[in-house]
Amino acid sequence: MTNQRYVRTVQKQIPLIPNKNIIGEPEKKNTAMAMGVAAAWIYKRDPKAIIINLATDHLIQKPAAYRKTLKAAAKIAYEQDKLVAVGIVPTFPHTGLGYIHIGKKISEDGSMPAHEMKGFTEKPNLANAKKFIKT
């Protein structure tokens, strides 16, 4: 799923993905709506599919570790039939990002622990972002 105007660019940049699998957003309605449309589209074609939704505005400094994390997340999703959110531990309060509130540990693959998600706060105000950093 991408913005309609980027479909051709994505097709050129990722030639291994069949063009029919690159979807242009029918209408710009932000991330959650795009994720829902993409999930419905994929589910219609394969109800057992494991879906990984990735933002495109981040820098991946350790590609091998990133791939390992995504594989571990997909494994948990498949084996435990769980919805998985991958996050990083923030180093400073940021009001433009969402915060995952973690619960009990459900598994650990080497250095990658997996926790239940107690909640999620999307783009908190600065006071709350500062609280989240401390916890």
Question: What positions do the PLM features span?
Answer:
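Conserved N-terminal catalytic core of the sugar/cofactor nucleotidyltransferase
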Residues: 1-53, 61, 71
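Cofactor-binding loop segments of dinucleotide-utilizing enzymes, especially the Rossmann-like FAD-
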Residues: 3, 56, 88
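Proline-rich low-complexity regions
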Residues: 15, 26, 55, 90-94, ...
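Residue-level signal for inorganic ion chemistry
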Residues: 38, 57, 100
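Conserved core of the sugar-phosphate nucleotidyltransferase
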Residues: 63-135
